[in-house]
Amino acid sequence: MSTDRLTAHGVFVEVEGLGVWLSGASGAGKSELGLELVSRGHRLVADDAIEFRIDAGNPAYLIGRCPPLLDGFIEVRGLGILNLRRLYGDASVLGEHRLDLAIALDARTEPSADERLTGRRSTVNVLGIAVPEISLPRRVGHNLAVLVEAACRDHRHRAAGYNACDDLVARQAQHLIAQAAAAANPAPAASATGSPVEPHQQD
């Protein structure tokens, strides 16, 4: 078995310029989510079987592609096999892409208090490379396609050094500091005319 190649289960799509590996248990809705993302203008790389290899030009990255036999096809429960090139045009399918983010469709309990702020974030090891992974709760009524798009945009900002949770915590800290300073140095009381009250001078 090659140590620089791996065939993995799931759906591989290009979203917002990022290569996203959708994983989860059988029946989790990976292919349906992939189809919805394609309908929103994103591109399918592979469904069901994804061939990952280490990028020869940059060993720190992985490249994912579809086996030639399955190129452009997706299997959706209730619809069967669909040819996306026929349905959405050649631009809906991409030959290969770098793997940037893994998203696991998760049917576990609700996120903890900390996870509500930070998200369920970890890494998954693929051929010795740690790939950022987000676990998205799968619930009735959730628009997973929108969540995946938002996750990709947020991932780009994080890669550039911005973290929304850290930003909010810093903003709250600044607000508390300002409140404490205002309490320690109260403003002079105002008169009925709106001007500060001057101390009474005795003759």
Question: Can you say where each PLM-predicted feature lies in the sequence?
Answer:
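A short, structural micro-pattern
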Residues: T7, G95-H97, G128
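Accessory recognition modules or surfaces
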Residues: T3, A25, A56-A60
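A short, compositionally biased
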Residues: T7-H9, A46-D47, T118
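Glycine-rich phosphate-binding P-loop
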Residues: E16-L44
